[in-house]
Amino acid sequence: MQLLLKQRFFSWFDSFDIYDEQGNTKYVVRGELGLAHKFSIYDSHDNYVGSIAQRAFTLRYTFNFDVTNPDGSGTLQGSVIKQFTLFNTSIVVNCNRNYSLYGSWPGWDYTVYRDNQTCATFSKQLFNLTDTYVCEYANPEDELMCIVLLVAIDAIKCSQN
């Protein structure tokens, strides 16, 4: 399965539209005003799905998240923490599932692991007016975690520049 996360061009805050393989809007992520990055996630029917919020005043980029599957099948709660590394990106995910994420040196390609097995890959599409990421995943229950990780990655990249 595939998702396309595309940042909105005219937006006061970081906001994203997330499309499925057919080009239909599947989720909308809306940025909110605050001292640090904060996002709310909505499904295609504008129902609240969850939130992602950066912890302010920390040495490492840390995001707390709380999302519920739209079908009501479960909730993900935890944090995403960027580790200090020299050449590649390493992100630790503390939640009720065993996820980890590693990125390439320029920060354009990422691999997500669940229980030490590859569950998703992200790649940044270059030559677009806005930040655009493609997410490939196999298991539908990893979909919301992919969205959380992509939004956190983009916020980290935005903060570093």
Give a label for each model feature.
Residues 1-161:
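Intrinsically disordered, low-complexity proline/glycine-rich segments
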